Amino acid sequence: MDTAAITGIHHLTAVCADAQRTVSFYTGKMGLKLVKQTVNFDDPGAYHLYFGNVGADPGSLLTFFEWPDAVRGHTGIGTTHHVAFETATAATQDRWKRWLTGNGIKVSGPYDRVYFRSIYFQDPDGLIIEIATRGPGWTVDEAPDALGQELRPPPVETTAGHRDEAAIAAVTWPEPVPAIDAEMTLERMHHITFMASDAERTMAFYAETLGMRPLKRTINFDDPTSPHLYVGAGDGAPGTVITWFGYRPGSRPRGVVGRGMTHHFALNVADEDAQRAWQERLAAAGVPATEILDRQYFKSIYFQDPDGHILEIATAGPGFAIDEDPTHLGEALRLPAWLEADREAIAGRLRPLTVG
C-alpha cells in the first residue's frame, strides 16, 4: 500500500469580487456551510472563505479569495473549466434544477454524460458549476480492470448538434421546491474539469507522475472535436476525479485567472510524511515544488502541471475545528497566530460579513 497516495480532491479555490454576495449565494442558494472566515495568508488584506459540508471534510471544500479589483477571468488552456458537485440521483438533480430556476438562476441540462447526468449554472461571478449524479459509473461500457485503456465514443444522440435540446430544457421537477432538503444536500464534489493543450501529455502527468488511475477516454460531448479524459484516485469514486478537455496546441487561447475563475485546486493526502514523499517524487520527475507551507487547517505544497495549472497537495488535517467550536464554524473571522498582532488592521481592511 502506498501511504503517500493521493486519495482524492481536497479543495478548489476560486476568485470572487464580493465576499458577502458569495456567502449569500453559496449558503443560501447552494446550501453549503461557511466553515471558515479567514484571510489569504499570502495576501492578508483579502478574505479567504471556505465552504463545505457540515463536517468541513476534504473533498467538500470550495474556497474563495475576495479580490474586488481582479479582472474578469475566462476559461482557456491552463485554467479550470468547471467544478462539479455530487447529487445522489436524477430525481434529486431535477429538484436542484427546479430550486435554482425558481431562484432566478439559469440552468442548462440535464445532459446524459453516459457515466453520470449533469446540469450546469454559474455563480454571481461566472464560475461554472455542475451538479452531477453519482452514477451509473465508469463500468457501464468497460470492465473494471480495463478502465481508461481505449477510446469510448458516446452515443451520437448525447452529443451537441444531435441531442434534443428542447426536450432536455423541459426536464425539471414537477412541483416547486421550497427549500434545499436533506436529500439534496451537496456533501462532496464529484469532479474538477480543466482545459489542456495536449491530452496525452496531461494523462502521462496525472497517471504516471501523480499516480492517479486512468478511468475513461471519451470525447467532449459538447465539442466532439476534442477528447475528454478522466483520472481518479482509488476506484475513481466521485470526489476523487479530475478530467480535462484536450485541444490542439495553439487552437485555444490561454485562460485568465480572475473573478469567476479557479485559482488552483488541491489533492488530498494523509499527512506531512506523504507530502515529503511527494516533494521527492516531484523533484525526481523534474517538477519544482514549494516547501511545506502551514495553512493552519492543513499543510500544503504547490507545483504546476504541464499547462501551468497551479496544483496543491494538502493534508487531510488538522482540520477546521482547530481554532473554532465545530458547531460554530465560519461564524467569526479567524487568523493564524502569526497574524493575530495585526488583527485590528486586517479587520479594518475587510468588509464585515453577515452570515446566516
Label every PLM stretch briefly.
Residues 39, 69, 136, 219, ...:
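Residues that form or immediately flank small-molecule/cofactor binding pockets and catalytic motifs
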Residues 4, 15-58, 110, 194-239, ...:
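Core segments of cupin and vicinal oxygen chelate
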Residues 8-9, 175-221, 226-228, 235, ...:
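Surface-exposed interaction/gating patches
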